[in-house]
Regions:
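Charged, amphipathic alpha-helical segments and their flanking helix caps
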Residues: 1-38, 48-147
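A short glycine-rich, His/Asp/Glu-containing loop-to-beta-strand
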Residues: 42-46
Length: 147
């Protein structure tokens, strides 16, 4: 499995085990909130996004190079509640995701660091469904040229 997939699967796994709030449905497949029942909220869609890579060391004997990568992972959280409770519910979800991901910033030992860098509130959903889009940056290193 690629490191990118290992990171995404780790994020899915830790979010599936989160409590208060507990995420009922966590997936790497896109979510259509109109197709979900009330019992499936709050739910999360995790997707790997863009990535920047650079050499960390020059090539050495044997042709290997240590590289460093910053992978952006989108964590899209859907909540369903009354319009009066929407802001509170979204804020609770944001805080919980950050706390859960901070518990192991190495993503099970494959990364060097994990940080929540951006929170975007999307109000273009129906009034009882809220969406917060979290950008998670994961720093990891890998070696190229290994046989």
């Amino acid at each position: 499995m690629s490191i990118r997939n290992s990171i995404a699967e780790n994020i899915v796994s830790v979010l599936e085990n989160a409590t208060d709030p507990q995420f009922v449905f966590v997936t790497r497949a896109p979510i259509d909130p109109q197709q979900l029942s009330n019992a499936q909220y709050p739910c999360v869609y995790v997707e790997t996004l863009d990535e920047s890579r650079e050499d960390d060391t020059m090539g050495v004997a044997g042709g290997t190079t240590q590289r460093q990568s910053i992978l952006n992972v989108g964590v899209n959280c859907y909540v369903k509640t009354s319009p009066e409770m929407m802001d509170i519910t979204r804020n609770d979800v944001i805080e919980r995701v950050e706390e859960v991901l901070d518990a192991d910033r190495t993503r099970g030992g494959v990364a060097w660091d994990t940080q929540l860098t951006t929170v975007t509130v999307n109000n273009d959903v129906e009034s009882t469904i809220g969406l917060v889009q979290l950008n998670i940056q994961v720093l990891y290193k890998y070696t190229t040229g290994e046989a």
